[in-house]
């Protein structure tokens, strides 16, 4: 004979299933900086951003995934200084606000790295969202508007592409025609300037020169 469960037994609720913690719930969204700051990448605060951290990070992030010739990586810090040189060569005097905008145009890469264009296209939405939020916060920290005027963005982009052409052909193994299709042809630089800015510096040199140029525009 089959024994039926009693009414008391039937009325008892089943025990709850164990709650599984997802990877997202466990993920850490902040980066500890050498300054002691803790920067939340998803909700960054201007109070947690220091130029010393930016300079240190950018001087150690490689352009072109590190696929460049020379004794050192060609760092994002050195690239930034080359962009600033290209802008001055293009328009002459660079005022304080434009100079700051140029010096900070790749600043988010001190925490998210310099992702190469082909891979960036694969995860564009996620990467761009974090990058734009970080850049807006960095701008606020150093007295710039979160979103730059379109004219300023276009000028920086033109100087950035000119710098990329030189890096591609002098350091990254591109031939001129190949680079021309991607970046356009830049204005010529004096040989002494090109020789200096396209010879990869050590991380310490890149960090020092980046800070010197930044303080020229920021004034502190």
What is the role of each PLM region?
Residues 2-220:
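Metal-dependent phosphohydrolase cores
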């Amino acid at each position: 004979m089959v024994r039926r469960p009693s009414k008391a037994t039937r009325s008892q609720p089943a025990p709850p299933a164990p709650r599984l913690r997802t990877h997202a719930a466990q993920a850490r969204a902040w980066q500890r900086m050498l300054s002691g700051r803790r920067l939340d990448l998803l909700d960054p605060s201007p109070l947690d951003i220091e130029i010393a951290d930016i300079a240190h990070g950018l001087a150690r992030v490689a352009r072109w995934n590190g696929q460049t010739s020379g004794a050192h990586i060609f760092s994002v810090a050195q690239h930034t200084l080359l962009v600033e040189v290209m802008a001055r060569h293009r328009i002459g005097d660079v005022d304080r606000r434009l100079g700051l905008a140029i010096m900070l145009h790749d600043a988010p890469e001190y925490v998210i790295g310099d992702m190469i264009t082909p891979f960036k296209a694969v995860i564009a939405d996620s990467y761009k969202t974090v990058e734009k939020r970080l850049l807006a916060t960095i701008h606020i920290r150093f007295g710039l508007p979160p979103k730059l005027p379109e004219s300023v963005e276009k000028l920086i982009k033109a100087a950035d592409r000119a710098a990329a052409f030189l890096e591609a052909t002098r350091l990254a193994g591109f031939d001129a025609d190949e680079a021309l299709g991607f970046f356009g042809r830049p204005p010529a630089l004096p040989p002494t300037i090109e020789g200096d800015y396209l010879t990869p510096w050590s991380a310490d040199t890149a960090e020092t020169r980046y800070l010197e140029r930044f303080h020229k525009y920021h004034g502190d």
